[in-house]
């Protein structure tokens, strides 16, 4: 399995490196030049290494990102052939915004395959490698705004599979009443793009503005009433905000020095890039057309498509995903329309959701899952993943779906409207690497130095109950003066080990807080750049 950080400037991908500070509460990132003193760090102000953060040095939109990804794969699989699967099949899984860049990528890769095979590709030497494409899996994908926007109001009010009223009826009615104008604006975006930017490259300023304005209007009037009034999590409507789940521990893990060293990366990991996000949004990438057509193209060329949704997600509602699957125009459309919703038998005793499947297309409603489906339902997600890859029916994993004639068609319920009771998501806790998980009063305590922080966890009754061994070790270390954690008060004694790790660039000399790990109290001069360590 390969984890592909794209477009450039997200995750561990970078163009050029720059030294920065990052405020965990505000999200503000500030560049440090060669003469800027390295500031003292605390539980919310961290230093590290990021990409350039130049918005001109990333891909502009899903189509341009797809082109860049193809060039990368041409190099990757030829320079590192041992990473190619034994059967040479390549599949792609993408989540959330991946509902757009997943289809854009996979369809472009297949188009390039066909150009190479019929000798119409006039690219450079060494870019003739055929990518044998197998499956596109989209998890909680926002794929087509025109199709999916009408399903946000019902996800917010009663018709979400749980009877949850996240907003009141007045707000719900306002959301519903906004749908016609929203769709009109999206259609205007698409009509304008069809004339002046049909390939969705973001090359026409008027198209960019019309499409961005359409998305802004729709979001303001259909999505924001939920986020502003419900008090519930955007990615799990059963949970009040801030959400206790899923954990953001990967953020701390991927920024540990030993992890970075093992991966051979010279910078800090970041979950998202404002520059990359803005580059996509500024051209109005969200409401543009073609992603449905891309899915139909893939299906007609024998490539499997699985659309997987969590029924507690508000970001990309599951009923909208169901509508997308029905709206795909492909040679199997009539067969898919005749399919029914079958129970997904995760194991002998648990039903993990519903699936509608015909041939190579499947749509899944995953029970009791928010936006990050594998975190909520790991076994069900794993079974869906493996069954899709190995040409087995999603419902049971016992029937082959590989036949091109008399394709498999699921049977079961006529509608996916099973009503459930939401399960308890557990105790909430504040993880300072993800400030959105913290209540305002916790943030205030962190900022004024009165909080007790252990491995980026805000220490309170909940975290002591949830992570007793971790908290106990931190407190023992503090008592012994070993500093494994962030201590209490103003964090002056013992000196905290820095939570945001990485290395600076260009041989910059700086001062860093070393902590007692090296037996030094205070600051240590570094000749090889800024080295931030964490116990």
Predicted regions, residues:
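Acidic beta-to-alpha connecting loop that harbors the catalytic carboxylate
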Residues: 97, 311-312, 368-370
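Post-His helix in hydrolase/transferase enzymes
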Residues: 375-387
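Cleavable C-terminal sorting propeptides in eukaryotic secreted/cell-surface proteins
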Residues: 501-535
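Short glycine-enriched nucleophile-adjacent loop
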Residues: 99-114, 136
